[in-house]
């Protein structure tokens, strides 16, 4: 029986790339999307029929479900292959991730409102609001990633970090009656499962969720899913100037 599986890449650098992120010229996407322009510099490799034999994939923030494939070089400049698409290489900019830090498991901080120490630690985050119609605010996030760390151990955070039940809550003016809401991040490899699904509490008028997580610094956001349609930004909003990693 398979216990777990994980996708990985074997990387062998054969060429250089030059990548830039631009706003789209198409005004429909000017405020919300990013267009990736790039060049492939072959160095000592000779690309024969690159439009047929060269396969290009772009990923946003190491998330495989974001990939754009099969872009063809538009023209050649000296030895460089140039890709200067507008809409064909577009991504939603998204928003900076929310975050919390439980490295000091007994203490509150900027984004933690309360810690219950009476049993297995329970960490209550401050209430989040939907950001779809808010202005962009820069936040130096780690693009959905997480880092295990603790101030309570003496040597190795990965083995000495403790666990805590982290309580999430989302207040939203939007109606998500036909959508499922999830807590989203690399902490579970961006999966949508019953464990990171949120449930509506009508008495508090909040969506709530609880995750058992090891001490550390975590990025997260809230996303919605309606049947087979996934929307990563209808709660957090999307901005063309958001900082992202592309590869």
Model regions and ranges:
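A short beta-turn/strand-edge loop motif at beta-sheet boundaries
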Residues: 44-51, 174-177
